Amino acid sequence: MPANENERRERLKAISEVYFAGLAQKDMSAVPWAEDVVVRSPLAPEGLETPMVGAPAVHEWFESLFPVLGEIRVIEHYYNEDLTAVATRSDVGITDPQCTLRVVDRFHVNNEGKITEQENHYDPRQAIPASD
């Protein structure tokens, strides 16, 4: 594999790991989201079908999750053929209700190293508190 492909793969991996480190540290300020990033997640305010658009909205949503985030463990990374996206398998601990989400988050990254699209894949049912 040519050096530029290795470098691109390492760059994608580093961007993903910055994201997961941000979750673990409850500080997403280092995550390189593009200003017009599009993020889809099952627990997003409008659900999976309606994406959050824009870095400010994404930051605000992640900050709302901080109180229930527990241990974060990155397991492995997968790359698309043209090295424009990385998907990372991780375990994301939730403290209330206590559970572990088995997650695959996909990041599309532009040539400037900014995340332009993100899609989070997990089954959210165990993270939703039971209603009384």
Regions found by a protein language model. Name each.
Residues 1-28, 35, 130-132:
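Short, low-complexity N-terminal intrinsically disordered segments enriched in polar/charged residues
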Residues 7, 50-53:
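Alpha-helix N-cap and loop-to-helix initiation/capping positions
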Residues 29-30, 78:
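Short secondary-structure boundary/capping segments
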Residues 13, 17, 56-59, 63:
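Generic alpha-helical structural signal
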Residues 36-51:
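A short gly/proline-enriched turn/hairpin at secondary-structure junctions
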Residues 2-7, 59-132:
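A beta-strand edge to alpha-helix "cap/lid" segment located at domain peripheries
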Residues 26-28, 55, 112:
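Residues at or immediately preceding the N-termini of alpha-helices
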